[in-house]
């Protein structure tokens, strides 16, 4: 089987490249097996690691994408269609079309499903601002969790009950974010959300999901400390929680380092009896100066390797999900910062390229699974 080192060595040779549909594919990619026992999910299963990805509603209509999804992954999460805003166009009304389609696909292919998410400060319904008050916000939140959680009860491996509740720079007590939920209900919205979720779907793993807590920077250290403190309060108060989701939106070419901080975060969660999931993994390549796709892929793959080698040291890490499958669908291309910094260059942050062919990150992820201890 080809290794990451062999792949990157081959990818760096100009003679290995073929121009296809505006992207560069390497001979190594076409020749090496990637399905069956060579798939990401099979390499993950050997180590007891669930292998997943976020799926957009439009992508799920593509038959080639469907085949790739079923071949490579055993866990899926909806990119947007289970969020409050996309689900609820009017108060009390829900459009289940896209969410149901993903659940049906996953069940057909015997894949697990992550629910994302019940409570978040962003992507709220258009009606929320004018409708929600301090008098009715609790009912809106509880009804929403009951409605969505109840519809998919018993079908969801884990729910991101609360997403991104920490924002130290907001200056609120305990580093909590000054979100609409906080302002309308107060900090008790957190405990209420988890108790409601447990009541609604007792078998789902209840997760707290957060970003910007992974690297060794001072800002990440502050947010990491606030996150671990929140989890400790949950445990002390009897708030039902089973897992920490580390989003893992990280960067290549920027000098970010991962080591002490990641180990501190994962061990802190593990000591509280929590499982750990890497929930939204991708590697932003805007910081890589060279425009050559081979150079960028090598840089991105190196970050995947370094990050996963550290994270997967711990048997507490039970799942690795990338935020998307192929470069053609990544959300990073829509970011304002990307459009301003690299207006003529599309991101290559994921394990498959625009043509659904494996990139260097594919082999980096697969090799990282092989090196991880069995859990």
Where are these regions (language model features)?
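Short, acidic/polar
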Residues: 58-70, 140-145, 222-233, 304-307
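Glycoside hydrolase catalytic-domain groove-lining segments
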Residues: 107, 187-192, 201-208, 224-290, ...
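N-terminal substrate-binding region of glycoside hydrolase catalytic domains
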Residues: 45-100, 112, 117-132, 245
């Amino acid at each position: 089987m080809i290794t990451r080192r062999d792949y990157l060595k081959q990818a760096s040779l100009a003679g290995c490249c073929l121009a296809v549909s505006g992207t560069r594919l390497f001979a190594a990619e076409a020749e090496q097996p990637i399905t069956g026992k060579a798939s990401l999910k099979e390499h993950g299963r050997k180590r007891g690691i669930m292998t997943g990805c976020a799926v957009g509603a439009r992508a799920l209509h593509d038959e080639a994408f469907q085949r790739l999804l079923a071949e490579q992954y055993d866990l899926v999460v909806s990119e947007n269609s289970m969020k409050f805003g996309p689900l609820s166009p009017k108060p009390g009304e829900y459009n289940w079309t896209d969410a149901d389609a993903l659940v049906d696909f996953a069940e057909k292919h015997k894949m697990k499903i992550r629910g994302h998410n019940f409570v978040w400060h962003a992507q709220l319904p258009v009606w929320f601002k004018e409708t929600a008050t301090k008098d009715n916000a609790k009912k809106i939140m509880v009804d929403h969790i009951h409605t969505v959680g109840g519809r998919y009860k018993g079908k969801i491996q884990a729910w991101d009950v609360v997403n991104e509740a920490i924002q130290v720079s907001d200056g609120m007590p305990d580093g909590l974010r000054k979100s609409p939920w906080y302002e309308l209900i107060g900090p008790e919205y957190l405990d209420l959300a988890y108790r409601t979720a447990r009541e609604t779907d007792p078998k789902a793993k209840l997760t707290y999901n957060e970003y910007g807590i992974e690297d060794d920077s001072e800002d990440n250290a502050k947010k990491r400390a606030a996150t671990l403190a929140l989890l400790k309060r949950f445990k002390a108060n009897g708030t039902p929680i089973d897992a920490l989701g580390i989003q893992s939106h990280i960067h290549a070419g920027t000098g970010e380092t991962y080591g002490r901080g990641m180990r501190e975060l994962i061990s802190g969660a593990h000591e509280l009896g929590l499982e750990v999931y890497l929930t939204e993994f991708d590697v932003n390549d805007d910081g890589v100066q060279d425009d050559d796709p081979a150079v960028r892929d090598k840089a991105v793959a190196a970050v995947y390797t370094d990050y996963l080698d550290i994270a997967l040291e711990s048997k507490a890490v039970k799942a690795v999900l990338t935020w998307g499958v192929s470069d053609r669908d990544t959300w990073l291309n829509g970011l304002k910062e990307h459009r301003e910094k690299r207006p003529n260059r599309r991101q290559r942050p994921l394990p498959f390229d625009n043509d659904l062919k494996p990139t260097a990150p594919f082999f980096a992820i697969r090799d990282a699974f092989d090196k991880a201890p069995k859990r």
